[in-house]
Structures are given as structure tokens and as C-alpha cells.
Amino acid sequence: MAAARRIVALLALALVASPAALAAPSRPAVALSTLERSVLVDINALRAQHHLSKLRFSARLTTAALAHSQQMANDGYFAHESADGSAFWKRVQRFYASSQWRFWSVGENLLWSVRDIDSHDALSLWWESPEHRRNLLNPAWREIGISALHAAQAPGIYGGLDVTIVTTDFGVRR
């Protein structure tokens, strides 16, 4: 559990959900950290290299991502599902409503690390996973929310280590 020990864990499953339908967007104030801003810039640069549209920042998706990062850090688990076992899309839907929309879909990429991580590291890890790469390059996505949470002495799967948990939630509503 020494600080010098470097472990990077990446959930190899990137999920996508698409129940039809639903809600009016509004923009609660959310300030992005330097890491979160860098992840947004780098994802959009990657998408531009592949001739895909730039993702718009979504305060609602960012709030969903932060809530999940906090829950995983506090409860000591790492998964797309919520602590109660509910599907990730149901959690995201509480923040990024689907009502009043004909089409609604969300996806999510996660990672955690015991070392400082930058946006290049995050994208490199996600790029190595076919499921995560598909989320990064999904042409349907229009919006993104990002959370990079630093948790000291995180319990459970994190073994009491200081960790960084990064959650990106992707979405489209039309």
C-alpha cells in the first residue's frame, strides 16, 4: 500500500443503454477541474481526428458522473452498476432525463488509478479497450459529462489507497 506502488485498473466493460424517450435540458453550474477539462479537450481532439463531431459539455451528465465517482469511492467498489445493483443507465437517467425526447441513449467509460493520471493516460487506457474505444468514437454521442475524483484512503477494492476515479458519461437526446 505504499504510495510508490502504481496500479491502474480499467473496467473492461463500457456500457451503452438506449431506452426511448424524454426531458428538457437545463445547465446547473458545474466547474471542471484541470484534469476534467483536459479529458474533454483530448476526447474532442481524438474525435476530430476520426472526422466525428465535437461533444458538448453537459452539466447534467457531469453531475451524474460525479455522483457515481463519489459513490464508488465512498463504498469501495468499481462498476458501472450503482451500489444497489441498478443499471448504470437508470442512474444517469435521474440526472439526464429522457422524457420529452424521441430518442435517448447513454454510455459510460470508467477508470481508476493509484497514481496521478493525466488525460493522455486516461485516453490511452480507454483506447486499448474495444468497448471503451467504441464509446469514444461513437458518432451518435452529442454530449459528455466528466468527473475526475481524488479519494484519500479509499476503502474496499481500492485497499485504502489514495486513488483517482474518472467517470465519463456520454449522451444523446433528440
Predicted features along the sequence, with ranges:
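Bacterial N-terminal signal peptides
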Residues: 9-18
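Disulfide-stabilized extracellular recognition modules
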Residues: 112-174
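Extracytoplasmic
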Residues: 34, 52, 87, 105-107, ...
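Surface-exposed patches in mature extracellular/periplasmic domains of secreted proteins
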Residues: 49-64, 76-85, 100, 133-148
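Short, surface-exposed glycine/acidic/tryptophan-bearing loops
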Residues: 63-116
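Sec/Tat signal peptide C-region and signal peptidase I cleavage site
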Residues: 19-23
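A short alpha-helix/helix-coil micro-patch that ends at or immediately precedes a cysteine
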Residues: 27-75
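Bacterial N-terminal signal peptides that target proteins for export
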Residues: 1-8
